[in-house]
Regions:
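Cysteine-centered metal-binding/redox modules
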Residues: 2-159
């Protein structure tokens, strides 16, 4: 995906969030068990903007409908854009926990980051879960989640 297209999608997502800023968000429901903020995801936001859905569909080679995700929990862990079943979702369903941050085995291998998936937000899961554990889900969702993704996609690495 080219930088120009990514920036266009980012701006579309910001516009969708601006239009929806007065709507209540159930952050617990809209945070995936693995710590991904579904409420910040471009695939979630695409359901509210047809042009955004078309742009993402073109980039990912998916149907427009498969780009419109309602969130991990609403999709029972099987978002249309994923070809595989989510092991994290299946695991958390068995435990009855809200997120992996609550699990005694956290972090486990299900949360392992992979470089071949670096353009997806999945490499932010462990960091998000650590922040949720430290500041609480609501504070993380309101104050940090969007910034973490922005920094991941658009920030510069520093030591």
């Amino acid at each position: 995906m080219g930088t120009e297209t990514l920036l266009k999608i980012r701006e579309m997502g910001r516009e969708v969030k601006r239009k929806r800023q007065n709507e209540m968000v159930d952050y617990a429901y809209m945070t995936a068990p693995c710590g991904l903020p579904c409420f910040e995801c471009y695939l979630y936001l695409a359901q509210f903007d047809e042009e955004m859905a078309e742009t993402i569909a073109g980039v990912l080679g998916l149907s427009k409908e498969d780009t419109k995700c309602k969130g991990c929990r609403a999709e029972d862990g099987q978002c249309g854009h994923l070809a595989m079943e989510c092991r994290v979702y299946k695991c958390i369903q068995k435990t009855g926990l809200q997120t992996c941050a609550e699990c005694r085995d956290f972090p486990c291998d299900y949360l392992h980051p992979y470089s071949d998936q670096a353009m997806k937000p999945h490499n932010t899961k462990v960091f998000n879960l650590c922040r949720i554990k430290k500041v609480g889900l609501e504070a993380w969702a309101k104050n940090e989640a969007g910034g973490i993704l922005d920094k991941y996609y658009y920030g510069q690495w520093t030591l």
